[in-house]
């Protein structure tokens, strides 16, 4: 009669015994796209419904160069400008 208790066999939970040994692969790698694609069209420059004449700016013509981007897009909110990468 054997008085010793049976020894428990400890096995690793991560390794399967008897299966083929294959190298583990990491997560798939994704490439960054160079151009961004939006679900909606980006906004157009200029204020909607803006007339040709500006009070106090007579005689300059309608060819006004916009220096600041928020002057061309002042009809939009900041989060809309940031969504399309304007600011």
Swiss-Prot record:
Catalytic activity: 3',5'-cyclic GMP + H2O = GMP + H(+)
GO biological process, one term: positive regulation of epidermal growth factor receptor signaling pathway
Compositionally biased region (Basic residues): 26-44
Ranges where the record places region Disordered: 1-55
Assigned GO CC terms: photoreceptor disc membrane; photoreceptor outer segment membrane
Residue ranges of the TM segments: none
KW Metal-binding (keyword) present: no
Biased composition (Basic and acidic residues): 1-12
Modified residues (N-acetylmethionine): 1
EC id: 3.1.4.35
The organism's place on the tree of life at top rank: Eukaryota
Keywords on record: Acetylation, cGMP, Hydrolase, Sensory transduction, Vision
One GO MF term: 3',5'-cyclic-GMP phosphodiesterase activity
Signal peptide: none
Entry-linked InterPro entries: PDE6_gamma, PDE6_gamma_sf
Function recorded in the entry: Participates in processes of transmission and amplification of the visual signal. cGMP-PDEs are the effector molecules in G-protein-mediated phototransduction in vertebrate rods and cones.
Self-association and partners: Oligomer composed of two catalytic chains (alpha and beta), an inhibitory chain (gamma) and the delta chain.
Family: Belongs to the rod/cone cGMP-PDE gamma subunit family.
PANTHER family the UniProt entry points to: RETINAL CONE RHODOPSIN-SENSITIVE CGMP 3',5'-CYCLIC PHOSPHODIESTERASE GAMMA-SUBUNIT-RELATED, RETINAL ROD RHODOPSIN-SENSITIVE CGMP 3',5'-CYCLIC PHOSPHODIESTERASE SUBUNIT GAMMA
Protein name: Retinal rod rhodopsin-sensitive cGMP 3',5'-cyclic phosphodiesterase subunit gamma
Taxonomic source organism: Bos taurus (Bovine)
Lineage: Eukaryota, Metazoa, Chordata, Craniata, Vertebrata
Gene symbol of the encoding locus: PDE6G
């Amino acid at each position: 009669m054997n008085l010793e208790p049976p020894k428990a066999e400890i096995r690793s939970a991560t390794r399967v015994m008897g299966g083929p040994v294959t190298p583990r692969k990491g997560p798939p790698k994704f490439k960054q796209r160079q151009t961004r694609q939006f679900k909606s069209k980006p906004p157009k420059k200029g204020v909607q419904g803006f007339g040709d004449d500006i009070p106090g700016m007579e005689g300059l013509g309608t060819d006004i160069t916009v220096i600041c981007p928020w002057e061309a897009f002042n009809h939009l909110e900041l989060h809309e400008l940031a969504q399309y990468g304007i600011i």
